[in-house]
Amino acid sequence: MDSKHIGNVNYLMENSRTGILAIGAHPDDIELGCGATLANLAQKGCHITAIILTAGNAGCASGISRHDESRQALNILGCQDLFTFHFEDTRTEHYLDAIITSIDDVIKTQQDAGIRFLRAYTMHDKDRHQDHRAAHQASMVACRTIPQILCYETPSCRLSFVPQAFEEFNEAGLENKISALKFHQSQKHRDYMQPTYIRSLAQFRGLQAGMALC
């Protein structure tokens, strides 16, 4: 995770309506970037809300619903609410105002339902994928009232990502993440979706932080 200060997460667990918001440009971004962390927070009682900005059509064959893949994957991770949008894949930078409004609307809807967001996870501003950068830009505006915003790591920002905060999870959390990613059958051919890749990265970041898995 990329943040100046992560703080103590215990304050997040005061009640079951404590909200965590996760934002991704495409189906699988959230699961790849913070899947184990979300599973851990869900188990501790946080209400997980996810937003996916595009259908990810440019990344798979026609006729496949990547939103459905993510819905199943995020369910495994304990996500209670998923909001999906259909902004144009690979061209989201042209719709920033509309994306900001869409995220704003989700936040307000959830707040009206009694959910109190204390943290948001979003994409990194130095990501090589233009949709990921747009997701970051929109999130920073739309989530301005949320006390803490953390940026997660994805394969397309690996070279530029320098973690400033680490979140530890256990073996069960890692297995949850690996199990969730298996629902993304349209992406199973990609190297970064393989369990050995996911585990190796978690171990590497753990070594950096003096933990078992991050």
Sequence positions of predicted segments:
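Short aromatic-enriched loop/helix-cap "lid" or pocket-rim segments at secondary-structure transitions
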Residues: 62-64, 133, 160-165
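Active-site rim/loop-helix segments in enzyme catalytic domains that contact anionic ligands
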Residues: 1-116, 141-145, 201
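Short histidine/acidic/glycine/proline-rich micro-motifs that form metal-
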Residues: 55-60, 88-92, 124-129, 184-189
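Structural signal for conserved beta-strand scaffold positions within catalytic alpha/beta enzyme cores
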Residues: 52, 84-86, 122, 151, ...
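Active-site adenylate/phosphate-handling loop in enzymes that bind or generate adenylated species
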Residues: 102-156
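Residue-level signal for the nucleotide or nucleotide-sugar donor/cofactor binding architecture
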Residues: 25, 130, 172
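The feature marks non-catalytic terminal segments
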Residues: 1-2, 7-14, 109-113, 146-148, ...
